[in-house]
Amino acid sequence: MKGTGIMDCAPKALLARALYDNCPDCSDELAFSRGDILTILEQHVPESEGWWKCLLHGRQGLAPANRLQILTEVAADRPCPPFLRGLEEAPASSEETYQVPTLPRPPTPGPVYEQMRSWAEGPQPPTAQVYEFPDPPTSARIICEKTLSFPKQAILTLPRPVRASLPTLPSQVYDVPTQHRGPVVLKEPEKQQLYDIPASPKKAGLHPPDSQASGQGVPLISVTTLRRGGYSTLPNPQKSEWIYDTPVSPGKASVRNTPLTSFAEESRPHALPSSSSTFYNPPSGRSRSLTPQLNNNVPMQKKLSLPEIPSYGFLVPRGTFPLDEDVSYKVPSSFLIPRVEQQNTKPNIYDIPKATSSVSQAGKELEKAKEVSENSAGHNSSWFSRRTTSPSPEPDRLSGSSSDSRASIVSSCSTTSTDDSSSSSSEESAKELSLDLDVAKETVMALQHKVVSSVAGLMLFVSRKWRFRDYLEANIDAIHRSTDHIEESVREFLDFARGVHGTACNLTDSNLQNRIRDQMQTISNSYRILLETKESLDNRNWPLEVLVTDSVQNSPDDLERFVMVARMLPEDIKRFASIVIANGRLLFKRNCEKEETVQLTPNAEFKCEKYIQPPQRETESHQKSTPSTKQREDEHSSELLKKNRANICGQNPGPLIPQPSSQQTPERKPRLSEHCRLYFGALFKAISAFHGSLSSSQPAEIITQSKLVIMVGQKLVDTLCMETQERDVRNEILRGSSHLCSLLKDVALATKNAVLTYPSPAALGHLQAEAEKLEQHTRQFRGTLG
């Protein structure tokens, strides 16, 4: 009555295997991976030809039909899954279990099948069990059972007898119940066995005991057939019949949850499936991580004090720990496979309890993880906090009993792949900048000007004769100070560049990220060479005898290398700054809220020092760069400090509330310091002398006067940027300073062209025009300042 047995099952449902991965393009489309088993709900979807409505892991959606393959029945006499059959049967008593007999026998009276609607309907009572059907990465399926009210639980992987003689077919275990798996499985009383295995494995058949009864047509399976399918003998428990992973009443929990290994004292040792078994045959792609281990004997003397998941039928990977006496759970083999992010497969999204081999080992790992977290939390900087890695290969498999902790582990598992790939960047990219757009632009421009001016200060000493003894002996100290300024300015700019790179890592524009990273790497390499050469010179205390060279060197020394790299830095810095300014809206957020009031702190003296500090630093730099005027500037700076402190602190020590920009008078101009006034006057004098040298048309004099104009102009720009504090005024000064720098560069290029093409009237005329443009802009710039 095979046909009748099939018809007795639930209504027919189609299953399909996914042939390819599918990434959904909309919310109605179903996502699945290759090898997933989908339940086809509807093949003719209105207005969606070529799409099927399918169900996977409790999610419904449309799936492309050309990516699915409908699964057909392999054998007509496949047993009907018992837990599907239970949906149609009457309620059962608390003393029944399921059994698959081996020989057709007339049925004996016994309890009916227990009702199994609890796993498919509504909320469960406190004593019910919730079933979840995971889709592990391997081809084997397991039924994970989560107990809500009592701790005993079991995860069983059951071999299919009718598949034992088909070793070439893919291995299967019970998954979502379907109706076409075979004939009806009848109930059996307690104290019965599924398989009656003789004591000697040489017997040709399987003979069940007299007490066993069955009413279904299961074909007789010989031992040779089982061996061909990977079985030598099967367990012969002396307790109740074969235990299926199905719901039972609380009173039966102690019987059905008893692990198979607990019968070891009453039964003979049995063999586990070999590597050629059709019961568990992982794909070749993952076979490297699974090494079949045939544990032929089960320990006889083991007494379990805690519930244990039976180990029968699982091929554990290499290095799996043995069970101890204080076992709480045994992790299934599907969860001992290497982590999901290492296999490029979908993570297990089900809320499966995870555990380690023993309570003691779990306690040790928890203690280690706690120490690591405390150590990592002790660091003050959150930008460069590194991801801590646990010394155990299974650190994230520890989970608490609460559903919240397990949910957090599941959610973190689903995003581990992307997290690992995005966090593999260097430590430099971990730092981020949280700056306003305007502040970021001002910062990068100020740092750029600082690098350019420091490099220009060193280039003033570089000429054809700068390594001669007389010249180098007079300027060795100034050159040393210039190298210090260059190293400091480049270091500050590189720190800012790393912060910009860290901010760019949060963007989706990979092209912008690559541009910023490449340009930052160029600056970083230059800075590394500067450090190496400067440290080499500092370690030798800048020996004059070694640095003096009266002839051309065949290979550059440390000082020459420093100058060569520093000469190229302004262009690299400018390129990086242009990238940041052009993409500022992507990298930084615009601060739309402008502060209307600015209040001084109660410590007015601190504010006074803050406003006076930049001129003091600039004064010190000028004292170092111009030793001849050291005494005069020292006296001037001390007077300036006293005057400015008296003016600022004496005005109003209380809150300072500036008028809104709309109410301010247009005549208000930035107030210049005495240093800036002096530099403006010096620049006008240098430009006048430059015009005089152009009239005489002497190349040497033209070069000298041009260098003087450029040097004074750079010092003026540097002083203006350092002394300006107010944001609105600072932006205005930075714009004028940037234009002034571009004009100085044009003058330098025109001077070079005029000298190389001397005595070309056209080149001299072009140089004259550039000098006039510089003078005109300088006068306009000076007029905008107070």
Swiss-Prot record:
Expressed abundantly in lung and spleen. Also highly expressed in ovarian and leukemia cell lines. Keywords: Cell adhesion, Cell junction, Cytoplasm, Cytoskeleton, Phosphoprotein, SH3 domain. Residues 399-427 have a biased composition (Low complexity). Pfam families: CAS_C (PF12026), Serine_rich (PF08824), SH3_9 (PF14604). Residues 273-295, 374-391 have a biased composition (Polar residues). It is found in: Cytoplasm, Cytoskeleton; Cell junction, Focal adhesion. GO terms for cellular component: cytoplasm; cytoskeleton; focal adhesion. The modification Phosphoserine is found at residues 200, 249, 305, 376, 390. InterPro entries: CAS_C, CAS_fam, CASS4_SH3, Serine_rich_dom, Serine_rich_sf, SH3-like_dom_sf, SH3_domain. GO terms for biological process: cell adhesion; cell migration; cell surface receptor protein tyrosine kinase signaling pathway; positive regulation of cell migration; positive regulation of phosphatidylinositol 3-kinase/protein kinase B signal transduction; positive regulation of protein tyrosine kinase activity; positive regulation of substrate adhesion-dependent cell spreading. SMART domains: SH3 (SM00326). One of its GO terms (molecular function) is protein tyrosine kinase binding. Residues 364-373, 630-642 have a biased composition (Basic and acidic residues). Phosphorylated on tyrosines by SRC. The keyword Phosphoprotein applies. Residues 11-73 form the SH3 domain. Residues 262-295, 361-429, 612-670 are annotated as: Disordered. Docking protein that plays a role in tyrosine kinase-based signaling related to cell adhesion and cell spreading. Regulates PTK2/FAK1 activity, focal adhesion integrity, and cell spreading. Belongs to the CAS family. Interacts (via SH3 domain) with PTK2/FAK1 (via C-terminus). This is Cas scaffolding protein family member 4. The gene is CASS4.
